């Protein structure tokens, strides 16, 4: 356990125990450090009383959504966007790494965490996510959680301020759609976490292109993943 994790564990023993439990139950692909960083970002938003909703784009089995739901104030709206099925194909804007990964998924040979079934092959995935949240004592109604199923370009229509967004959707077009829809509504002090900036070429390209002419309004911090905080409108 490094010093960063140790500080979090001592300061947030209940949340830390839940992070360990989420990982033990193989509900997330994220590292422990990444989940801790997500918690710290949510706690900063709550501490600073940043206005707006929380959202996650791409929730897989719901592991990170569980941690975000536990870290936020129960009354703050939280929307989970996902196709809740097999990921859509990449575009020509994505690099060879992305297309190779998609071929593996499409072939039926992708595997999940520690050899489990790959979540993209599972039917009724949204029901599994809701059930996983329930196992951690999270009721989606009393915790102001909304499940939004479908392609982001069809479903992501933001009409309120955003305090925090976890963007975990891999490919160029998906990431660019999320940024285009979310960033105009991101409050000052609000935070974006880009999960796949270093993992997939298309994600990195979408982020770099989108923020190329907007950098002065944001602070970019590379933690376990890329965190982007709005500092000005």
Feature map (PLM): residue ranges:
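S-adenosylmethionine/decaboxylated-SAM
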Residues: 4-32, 47-233
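Conserved alpha-helix/loop element of class I SAM-dependent methyltransferases that forms part
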Residues: 36-50
């Amino acid at each position: 356990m490094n010093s960063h994790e140790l500080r979090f564990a001592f300061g947030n023993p209940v949340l830390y125990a839940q992070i360990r439990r989420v990982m033990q139950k193989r509900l997330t692909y994220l590292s422990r450090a990444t989940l801790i960083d997500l918690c710290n970002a949510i706690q900063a938003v709550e501490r600073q009383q940043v206005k707006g909703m929380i959202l996650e784009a791409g929730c897989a089995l719901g592991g990170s959504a569980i941690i975000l739901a536990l870290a936020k104030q129960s009354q703050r709206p939280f929307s989970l966007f996902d196709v809740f099925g097999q990921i859509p194909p990449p575009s020509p804007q994505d690099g060879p790494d992305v297309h190779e990964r998609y071929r593996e998924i499409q072939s039926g040979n992708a595997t999940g965490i520690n050899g489990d079934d790959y979540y993209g092959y599972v039917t009724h995935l949204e029901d599994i996510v809701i059930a996983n949240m329930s196992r951690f004592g999270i009721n989606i109604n009393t915790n102001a959680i909304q499940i939004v199923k479908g392609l982001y370009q069809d479903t992501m229509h933001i009409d309120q301020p955003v305090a925090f967004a976890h963007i975990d959707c891999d490919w160029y077009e998906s990431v660019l759609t999320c940024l285009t829809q979310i960033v105009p509504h991101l409050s000052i002090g609000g935070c974006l976490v880009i999960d796949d900036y270093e993992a997939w070429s298309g994600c990195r390209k979408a982020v770099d292109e989108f923020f190329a002419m907007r950098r002065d309004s944001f602070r970019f911090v590379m933690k376990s993943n890329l965190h982007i905080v709005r500092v000005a409108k």
